[in-house]
Amino acid sequence: EQMFKDSLNIIKDCNLTHLHIFPYSIRKNTPAALMPQVPKNIIKKRARILREEGNRQMQEYLQNQIGNSAIMLVEKVIENISYGKSQHFTKIKIEDTIKEGEIVKCKITDMNKDILSAHII
């Protein structure tokens, strides 16, 4: 239980946002296989808690980006909206047609779920 709490505290203290949470799979003849195992229902509960905290941290991070500038690599354009990622791998959309592969400087103006909205500066 303490190791789980420590993991949760690390996520909070370090403001981690891109988490890859998955249950451990026992492998025969490994030191971990000989350790006491956590029941599956507890594993699922802990994974859910960690994912929720990661999502909360991500929403807070994205909210804090509003008003900041970013560098965006345009990955695709759909119906005059350019989509890409920032230098920090956050999703950004700009309501303008920008050539795929272009790198543009933009200002973050809003967010919706996990996508930041921006305009070119």
Predicted features along the sequence, with ranges:
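Conserved C-terminal portion of the radical SAM core fold
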Residues: 1-30, 49, 53-56
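Terminal RNA-binding accessory module
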Residues: 25-26, 33-121
